[in-house]
Amino acid sequence: MTTVNTDLIIYDDLAQTAFLERRQDNLAIFNASSNGAILLDNELIEGDFRKRAFYKVGGSIESRDVNSTEKVTGKKIGAGEAVSVKAPWKYGPYETTEEAFKRRGRSVDEFSEVIGTDVADATLEGYVKYGLKALAAAIGANADMVVTADIETDGKKTLTRGLRKYGDKFNRVVLFVMHSATYFDIVDEAIANKIYEEAGVVVYGGQPGTLGKPVLVTDTMDADAILGLVAGAVTVTESQAPGFRSYDINDQENLAIGYRAEGVVNVDLLGYSWDTSKGDNPDLTKIGTAGNWKKHFTSNKSTAGVLIKLGSAAGE
């Protein structure tokens, strides 16, 4: 009798199912918790870059002389181009002998479930890292949107220094992103500078240290910097269907199976474009290189956010 598919465990489907279930949960939670500043999406995008043209007007009203018969000169509108870049990634390969699971009284298909869940978590963390590296690089290259501060001496002014860059539009900043050590330094400072204490009861002004704004705490962020981001600051799009591959390993002493995955994301920043002269298919280092991004919006208040450089490393 011939063996058919129903006689076997097909790991690709099981691993991908675990991946999709975990990814669905991760995306829903993350997009909401980032307050819309960091968006994770999926959409089929062709080519190495996504290029979109837009109009640049930036007009304003002027005084009009009701008694004048002078001619007026027409003004031109301009055009700009927004460019996002594709960044390829890989996961694994991971391999295990079937014996390693059988000796534990476990089904070998558990390997695919474990790996499928892990790749979903790994890609989420990786996508966030791509986005934050790109933001820090692009904003860091725009001197008008960079400030310096020291948490120990500036306290809450560390964050308001960044908000000042937006002037009357400061409420556009919807999220602060910082390393965990930086976050605890800010909270420690807020506790040390309490507003009122009586018989052990302490009253603090608003949320300690963060001006009532949510904070994304991630150790993928540099410890000596804080990002203040507006809504839609970065969109990381899974721009090709990710590939998953489970495979048999039959040329070793023990029967084994392996698993690997690969995919591509587009990194799209608000107000900044990838410089296509810097090449395509960048790795994380190139994504995080300031000279590889350029501002295409005229107004800084319309761009992704502000970068606060800390005078001393967090935790010191």
Residue ranges and their predicted role:
Residues 1-85, 237, 242, 297-316:
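N-terminal "assembly arms/tails" that initiate or stabilize quaternary assembly
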Residues 2-3, 7, 238-316:
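Extended, compositionally biased alpha-helical segments that mediate assembly or anchoring
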Residues 14-19, 48-49, 53, 107-127, ...:
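Hydrophobic face of amphipathic alpha-helices
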Residues 65, 187-189, 226-229, 268-279:
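Short conserved micro-motifs at the rims of enzyme active sites and ligand-binding pockets
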Residues 77-106:
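Short acidic, glycine/tyrosine-flanked loop/strand segments centered on an H-E-D-like triad
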Residues 98-169, 282-315:
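Alpha-helical scaffold segments that mediate packing/assembly in large oligomeric complexes
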Residues 137-214:
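Extended, solvent-exposed, turn-rich assembly/linker loops in the middle of proteins
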Residues 200-256:
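Extended serine/threonine-enriched, polar tracts that run as long, contiguous segments within proteins
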